[in-house]
A protein has these predicted regions:
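Short acidic, glycine/serine/threonine-rich helix-capping segments at coil-helix boundaries
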Residues: 50-60, 66-110
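Exposed beta-strand-loop-beta-strand "reactive/processing" segments of non-cytosolic proteins
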Residues: 139-177
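Bacterial N-terminal signal peptides
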Residues: 11-21
C-alpha cells in the first residue's frame, strides 16, 4: 500500500513532468517576434512627422537616417530634402514611399540599426569574396535594404582588379549580398 508521503512525491513528480512537457520553448523565432513587438511599441510612441514638421523628433529622425547611410542634414526641420531621403529609405525598405514618417517607418529605422550591427558591411564583403574571389573589389553605398521577402541585403558593384589595372572599369556586375551568405547577381 502506498504511503501518503509516496503519493505526494508521485503527484509532485507528475506535475513537474507535465509542466516541462507542455511549456513553450524559447526559440529564435519567438525571441525575434518579442523583439519586433518591442520595436513596434517604441515606434508607436513617436509622433507622425511630415514636411513642415520641426522638433527634436525631426532631429532624431534625421540623425537616424544619417546613421543608416542616408545623406541628410540634421537641423530639426523636415523640409524637401528630408522628405526625399525618407522616400528613398521607405522605397529601400518596401514601405509606401509617401515621405511621411509614421509607426512603420520608425520601426523600419529601428530595425535597420539593429540589423546593421548584426550584419556589418565587412561581413557582406567577406561573403562576396568567398563567392567571387579575392581578385574582386566591392563598392557600396553602405545602405542595408530589404527585398520582396523582407530579407536584408547590401547592394554592391563588383570589379575585377586585373581589368582595372589594364585601364578598364573592371565592372563584373551588381550583386545583392545577404546575411545568410547568399550572393545574388542583380538582374535588370
Amino acid at each position: 500500500m502506498l504511503t501518503k508521503k509516496t503519493l505526494v512525491m508521485l503527484s509532485t513528480l507528475t506535475l513537474a513532468t507535465t509542466c516541462v512537457a507542455f511549456s513553450t520553448p524559447t526559440t529564435e523565432a519567438t525571441a525575434k517576434d518579442t523583439y519586433s513587438k518591442k520595436i513596434e511599441a517604441k515606434a508607436e510612441t513617436r509622433p507622425i512627422l511630415r514636411k513642415g514638421s520641426h522638433s527634436s523628433y525631426v532631429r532624431d529622425l534625421q540623425q537616424s537616417l544619417k546613421d543608416v547611410k542616408y545623406n541628410t542634414s540634421v537641423d530639426g526641420i523636415f523640409g524637401t530634402r528630408t522628405q526625399n531621403v525618407v522616400k528613398e529609405f521607405q522605397t529601400d525598405h518596401r514601405l509606401s514611399p509617401d515621405g511621411i514618417v509614421g509607426p512603420l517607418t520608425w520601426a523600419a529605422l529601428d530595425e535597420n540599426k539593429v540589423e546593421r550591427k548584426q550584419f556589418p558591411v565587412s561581413t557582406a564583403i567577406t561573403f562576396g569574396k568567398k563567392e567571387l574571389g579575392d581578385n574582386v573589389v566591392f563598392s557600396t553605398d553602405d545602405r542595408l535594404r530589404k527585398d520582396n521577402n523582407d530579407k536584408a541585403y547590401y547592394r554592391f558593384v563588383a570589379k575585377n582588379k586585373d581589368w582595372m589595372d589594364q585601364g578598364g572599369s573592371g565592372t563584373i556586375g551588381w550583386y545583392h549580398i545577404y546575411k545568410s551568405g547568399d550572393v545574388i547577381e542583380e538582374s535588370n
